[in-house]
Amino acid sequence: MKNGTTRSWCSILQMALVLVALAHLAYSSDKKPQAYRDINAIGHREIGYPTGVGNWYSLDKEKEIGTQASATFEKSTSLLRDPLTESYLDRLAQTIARNSDAQLPIMIRVIDSEDCYALTFAGGHLYITRGLLLRLQNKGELAASIARGVAHTALRSATGEATRTRLLGIAGFPVIGQDPPLPVNGTDSAFADKLVLLSYRRKDELAADYFGIQYLYKSGYAPECFGSFVQKAWPSSAKATFSPFPPLKTRLDALQKEINEILPKQSSAITDTEDFEAFRRHLLELPLPKPFPKQPVLIHSGSQKLD
């Protein structure tokens, strides 16, 4: 009798977890509230996976995890330590952050590599390669790259995905297509390590496009620059971040639809500036990048359990 009661409670618990998991999946559906379409509501709306059922990690916890992940990543990655470059990118990143829904501070660094890709870690840590910086043709495309990373931060994509993976794992369902899988149990540092290689789901990638182009527009840049940035970064970023990006045409069509239906016409929008040309010339004058590992060497540095 006791065993039967235990099994019944286990079944009830599993069903409850299934419902919670389904609620989380429903939260990430394609339906978008009116506020998501309102440019004037930017900065006054919560677009990301909210703390609770949709996200088991508080903003403070996410910030802590992101700090651990970026520190681990940087131990095996060559960064471009150039004050002029860092200052230029930081000013642009802060401008976009002020015109976004991000609830975490934004930090941006340059990976000293000729490869072309960008990375966004939990907690507002953005990385862009020197190769991608040199491939971009104008300041609008650079702003688009940063706006997309800011959108991932606002969406809380990393910890939202981690929560969904853990929910489905606890409920007894194998998570298909998660590469690499996040641990259900483990240390904070191990979890941070996994975030380094976390592949965002297709819906999260489309959402980053959807909100990123709004932040680009709100910051005064021509929204068309977002599409041209995606076309330049698409092949390399898909390979470098191990993410299941949607087809390029799907993304470009969605961006054009958003431009036509949501973004009001601008009387004057920034595409390029003289300071960008000076910035690009400065990059070309710097010494060539030094070789570094293609993938970060994951270093475990703590043993504190996840809350």
Predicted segment positions?
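Bacterial N-terminal signal peptides that target proteins for export
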Residues: 2-15
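Catalytic Zn2+-binding segment of zinc metalloproteases
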Residues: 140, 150-166
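A short, glycine/Asx- and small/polar-enriched loop/turn
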Residues: 120-124
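Hydrophobic h-region of N-terminal signal peptides that target proteins for export
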Residues: 18-26
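Short pre-active-site segment immediately N-terminal to the catalytic Zn-binding motif
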Residues: 130-144
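C-terminal capping/extension segments of zinc metalloprotease domains
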Residues: 11-14, 26-71, 78, 98-117, ...
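Zn2+-dependent metallopeptidase catalytic core
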Residues: 84-100
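Post-HExxH zinc-binding segment in Zn-dependent metallohydrolases
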Residues: 168-199
